[in-house]
């Protein structure tokens, strides 16, 4: 099995009622859905909870190119590869959020391939 595509889909929804946060009152909330598709048409779904468009850019421009063609079942190896190649960006924030969304999608693929729940 090989990874053939990774899609990062920004999500946005209205909050009723608005909620308070450190940034003030929020009427909208966003996130990022991560879909990883394999050559066997297995699609894993993950979520990168914050960052929206910026996290999408990290996935599209930085992480996706290093993962296309890889075996999605080698989760630890792929995680280490992403972690090592993003070292210069630090170990917090948007990059780790992007890695997390991909990691969740890879585990979803593993569960589906094994026909087991996560």
Q: Where are the language model's segments positioned?
A:
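Short, intrinsically disordered, charge-balanced linker/junction segments flanking boundaries
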Residues: 114-118
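Metal- or metallocofactor-binding catalytic centers and their adjacent structured scaffolds
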Residues: 37-113
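Structured beta-strand/loop patches that form or line metal/cofactor-binding pockets in enzymes
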Residues: 1-40, 45, 49
């Amino acid at each position: 099995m090989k990874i053939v595509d990774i899609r990062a889909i920004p999500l946005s929804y209205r909050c009723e009622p608005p909620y308070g946060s450190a940034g003030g009152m929020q009427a909208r909330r966003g996130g990022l859905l991560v879909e990883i598709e394999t050559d066997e048409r297995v699609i894993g779904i993950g979520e990168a909870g914050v960052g929206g468009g910026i996290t999408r850019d990290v996935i599209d421009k930085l992480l996706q190119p290093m993962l296309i063609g890889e075996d999605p079942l080698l989760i630890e190896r792929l995680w280490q590869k992403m972690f090592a190649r993003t070292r210069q960006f630090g170990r917090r924030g948007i990059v780790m959020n992007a890695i997390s969304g991909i990691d969740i999608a890879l585990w979803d693929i593993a569960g589906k391939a094994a026909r087991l729940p996560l």
